[in-house]
Amino acid sequence: LVGITTLRQKWEAFVKDGRFSYLTVDYLSEKFPVEDCGENLFIASHVIATQHMAECAVALKPGKALLADTRGGERILLAVRGSMDDFMRFSEQHDGCELFEDKVDAITNVYDIFMLNGRQIEEDFEVLTKGREGQSIPRSNTVIGDPDLIYIESGAIVEGVVLNASH
């Protein structure tokens, strides 16, 4: 969990058909198995998805791959469209890969979760509330910070509480 949603939920929000498999380490492969089909979209499980990134990954043609540079300066295999053989080939050598133009956020160390959490909360808030209209904040509540940063789902009962949106 980085921000409000998990890394998987971030990808699912942008990959509309939800069909992708993770490029992950061996011990996580049981929890996140590869979809059993001929052609697959493999994505790097430690990368925080953005709309543009997901669009570029989904648009890959079969047998193609996408590399990216992380903000930490590491070049990674971001996505592969194709078979398990294609994935293995691109994992070993990056010849013929396209380069994603933006730097990406990736969780490579435990502390990355904490360093990226604030910005991810803000980005997730935008995605989750886009096009939705919540209810106004009842007067029995105390608001600290910007009330525009507080979303209350219609029908929720929120009375007599302190809502802190300062940080």
Predicted regions and their residues:
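Terminal amphipathic alpha-helical/low-complexity segments used for targeting or macromolecular assembly
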Residues: 1-148
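A structural motif detector for beta-strand N-caps
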Residues: 135, 141-142, 150, 154-162, ...
